[in-house]
């Protein structure tokens, strides 16, 4: 089921999401929500979707960077961003640690701020400790584009948007970026 993606200005995007219990994660309601979030993310299309973006103030996000999303990028762009295919997965109740001092600055967009992008500085490497969709512990060490996606989605779970971190003078409509 495709869900409606809420847009900036909706108060749910500024709330810290509630953590889910193991029982909640395993419930049929949350499992159905995960499926709907996956379908919604793919339909948008996007590389991540956090529960607050569909109006649910809980600590849950889905992530996937499919081959068809990156097929038009040049080898240079993929290398510069350290971007590759990321299989579909779920993060629940994540805790993030920034690793090292290295950072990267690239344009980011958001399904909840349709039609705009801006340059956002992000840590180059992160470690995320969370639970997966089966409520099993998961540790993710990520760098490059994957680290950026994780930071973006975890920001959503904590009531933050990329516009809180962006270089404001780079904020632009997508059609202006393309030209």
Where are the regions that the model predicts?
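Active-site rim/adjacent substrate-binding subdomains
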Residues: 1-151, 156-179
């Amino acid at each position: 089921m495709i869900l409606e993606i809420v847009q900036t200005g909706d108060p749910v995007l500024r709330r810290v999401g509630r953590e889910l219990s193991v029982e909640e994660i395993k419930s049929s309601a949350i499992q159905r929500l995960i499926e709907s979030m996956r379908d919604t993310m793919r339909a948008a299309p996007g590389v991540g979707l956090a529960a607050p973006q569909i109006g649910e103030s809980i600590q849950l996000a889905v992530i996937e960077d499919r081959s068809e999303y990156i097929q038009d990028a040049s080898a240079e762009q993929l290398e510069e961003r350290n971007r590759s295919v990321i299989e579909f997965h779920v993060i629940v109740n994540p805790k993030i640690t920034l690793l090292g001092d290295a950072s990267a600055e690239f344009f980011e967009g958001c399904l909840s701020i349709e039609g705009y992008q801006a340059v956002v500085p992000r840590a180059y490497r992160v470690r995320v400790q969370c639970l997966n969709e089966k409520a099993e512990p998961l540790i993710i060490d990520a760098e490059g584009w994957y680290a950026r996606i994780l930071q973006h989605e975890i920001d959503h779970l904590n009531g933050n948007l990329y516009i809180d971190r962006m270089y404001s003078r780079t904020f632009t409509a997508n059609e202006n970026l393309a030209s």
